[in-house]
């Protein structure tokens, strides 16, 4: 049976920032991007330091891929209804913070935003989504391409290679066992354990680096606090969802009661249909007569 490991969202802000442990992050990013990714350094950017929430949920990583291109990888993990807006904000800050005053715009680095979410974000059945920027003609329906001169100067093939790229991992949508090496990583992100027989890059090292029993006493305390906070947030989300569902039901019952009043039904009949009390229905009648 696989052993439980430290959650990735906590480890990435603590253990995996250590250069000796870069191999774990490199493995994850290499499997996700289907490329050979090497981490150059963890960026101590302004956006990593402004608030406790930013510091806890986000890390910017300067990496190098197989084409010797420098890429900023942004990994976020948080519980927010406006998470899509947060993604946009994070990418914008990464771009602006890594272009010095007076530098030409051609020095803007490619940003890949990797977002790991453990809650229901948007509507979709898949568990891995990719987003990129393309310009499509309104009349000709063609895709705008780089000119030959631009390709030679910027060493890019497509316009989308310049603009930010997004990966959204909805790990709770993943069910069953892993079918490929990327799935093996998703399985780990969801279950905090490595599936037996996994061959994905970085997972073997993750089993060693993220062993809970290897944590120092202070780190164990911090990690347990993190787990408690996650449980509290999950309970808050369930409570908010239940409250919202209750409000929807009450509003539906009131709407049905009003329709019943307009149709001439008596209070007892309306009460049986809607489960509202006679007093509530009488108040509705009074309000409608005003």
Give the residues covered by each predicted segment.
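Accessory alpha/beta interaction modules
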Residues: 1-165
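A short, ordered amphipathic alpha-helix with a cationic face
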Residues: 1-2, 15, 174-175, 196-197, ...
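A generic short alpha-helical patch detector that favors 3-5-residue windows
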Residues: 3-4, 161, 177, 198, ...
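Generic recognition of short, well-ordered alpha-helical interface segments
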Residues: 7, 23-24, 82, 177-180, ...
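Short helix-capping/linker segments at secondary-structure and domain boundaries
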Residues: 34-37, 120-125, 175-177, 217-219, ...
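Short, charged alpha-helical interaction segments and adjacent helix-coil junctions
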Residues: 66, 71-76, 180-290
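Short, well-ordered beta-strand micro-motif
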Residues: 115, 168-170, 211
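Extended serine/threonine-enriched, polar tracts that run as long, contiguous segments within proteins
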Residues: 154-163, 168-184
């Amino acid at each position: 049976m696989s052993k439980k490991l430290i959650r990735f969202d906590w480890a990435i802000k603590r253990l995996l920032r250590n250069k000796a442990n870069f191999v774990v992050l490199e493995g994850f990013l290499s499997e996700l991007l289907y490329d050979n990714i090497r981490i150059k350094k963890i960026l101590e950017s302004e956006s990593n330091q402004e608030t406790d929430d930013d510091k806890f949920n986000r890390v910017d990583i300067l990496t190098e891929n197989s084409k010797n291109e420098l890429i900023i990888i942004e990994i976020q993990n948080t519980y927010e209804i406006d998470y899509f807006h947060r993604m946009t904000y994070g990418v914008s800050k990464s771009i602006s913070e890594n272009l010095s005053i007076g530098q030409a715009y051609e020095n803007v680095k490619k940003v890949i935003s990797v977002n790991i979410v453990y809650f229901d974000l948007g509507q979709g059945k898949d568990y891995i989504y990719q987003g990129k920027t393309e310009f499509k003609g309104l009349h000709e329906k063609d895709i705008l391409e780089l000119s030959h001169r631009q390709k030679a100067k910027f060493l890019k093939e497509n316009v989308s290679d310049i603009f930010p790229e997004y990966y959204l991992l909805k790990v709770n949508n993943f069910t069953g066992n892993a079918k490929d090496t990327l799935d093996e990583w998703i399985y780990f992100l969801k279950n905090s354990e490595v599936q037996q027989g996994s061959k994905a890059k970085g997972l073997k090292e993750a089993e060693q680096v993220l062993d809970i029993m290897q944590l120092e006493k202070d780190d164990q305390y911090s990690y347990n606090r993190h787990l408690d906070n996650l449980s509290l947030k999950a309970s808050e989300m369930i409570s908010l969802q239940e409250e919202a569902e209750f409000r929807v039901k009450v509003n539906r019952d009131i709407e049905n009661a009003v329709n019943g009043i307009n149709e001439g039904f008596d209070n007892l009949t309306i009460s049986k249909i809607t489960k509202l009390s006679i007093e509530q229905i009488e108040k509705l009648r009074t309000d409608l007569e005003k």
